[in-house]
From Swiss-Prot:
It comes from Shewanella putrefaciens (strain CN-32 / ATCC BAA-453). Pathway: One-carbon metabolism; tetrahydrofolate interconversion. One of its GO terms (cellular component) is cytosol. NADP(+) binds at G166, A167, S168, I232. This is Bifunctional protein FolD. Its EC number is 1.5.1.5, 3.5.4.9.
Length: 284
């Protein structure tokens, strides 16, 4: 068996095209164009790349894109005051603060300062809680994008045994909630997990988000399983690879996401979907 590739790049482009059409329809109906504010603190190269991609995608679909680049040594209060002003700005539907933040700024304080109805990253405790209660509104972008990828396979998720490797607040934990909502029996693995191989060998669906190149051997993958690889790791030779050993995994899986071109584009597409959702549901 050779796995079918889940083409995140193509699916994300399809979503962006639909969003662009919706923005055009809003304009023609005399409605406001959605607005997204993106805040970058410092000059971390990876963060600059991510932020640049988000701003470009925003403009591609016709959203208003506002950029705020703050110095690494900006104070926590300066950042919180900027968020307060954007919370009160009626032209802004979504506020995104690129993580990680410098050590002197507390992530949780910043995330909780963003109004829940403008939290298009889906990180605010209110929005995570809504997902936990099975009534999601603004959902965490990467898990939301992954659910779109899984849906594209046509596989019925109800009753599947799913394993999530990684328990971060950004991916692993909300991913577990998304899979529960989709009817999976879900196991979340982390650094204290015993018998990881055994758990993965039994899984119908595997989502890996640990940030370690080739962490999961491909031969662990159960024949016919769906493999979602969230990792994006740059090797010394410049090659980008995922957290799963791709070639071997593709021999066992029924569907697999490539790296790059799998989950990454979907995270940004989901961010744009959340921004339009916020405009329509909360701010029109």
């Amino acid at each position: 068996m050779t796995a079918q590739i889940i083409d995140g790049k193509a699916i994300a482009q399809s979503i962006r095209t639909k969003l662009s059409e919706k923005v055009t329809a809003r304009k023609e109906a005399g409605q406001r164009v959605p607005g997204l504010a993106v805040i970058l603190v410092g000059a971390d190269p990876a963060s600059q790349v991510y932020v640049g991609s988000k701003r470009k995608a925003c403009e591609e679909v016709g959203f208003i894109s506002r950029s705020y680049d703050l110095e690494t040594n900006c104070t926590e209060d300066e950042l919180l005051n900027l968020i307060d002003s954007l919370n009160d700005d009626p032209t802004i539907d979504g506020i995104l603060v690129q993580l990680p933040l410098p050590a002197h700024i507390e992530d949780s304080k910043v995330i909780e300062r963003i109004r829940p109805d403008k939290d298009v990253d889906g990180f605010h405790p209110y929005n995570v809680g809504r997902l936990a209660q099975r009534i999601p509104v603004l959902r965490s972008c990467t898990p939301m994008g992954i659910m779109t990828l899984i849906k594209s396979t046509g596989v019925d998720t109800y009753g599947l045994d799913a394993v999530v490797v990684g328990a971060s607040n950004i991916v692993g934990r909300p991913m577990t909630l998304e899979l529960l909502l989709a009817g999976c029996t879900t196991t979340t693995c982390h650094r204290f997990t015993k018998n990881l191989e055994q758990k993965i060998r039994q899984a119908d669906l595997v989502v890996v988000a640990v940030g370690k190149p080739g962490f999961i051997p491909g031969e662990w993958i159960k024949p016919g399983a769906i493999v979602i690889d969230v990792g994006i790791n740059r090797l010394d030779n410049g090659t980008l690879v995922g957290d799963v050993q791709y070639e071997a995994a593709a021999q066992n899986a029924s569907f697999i996401t490539p790296v790059p071109g799998g989950v990454g584009p979907m995270t940004i597409a989901s961010l744009l979907e959340n921004t339009l959702y916020a405009a329509e549901q909360y701010h029109d």
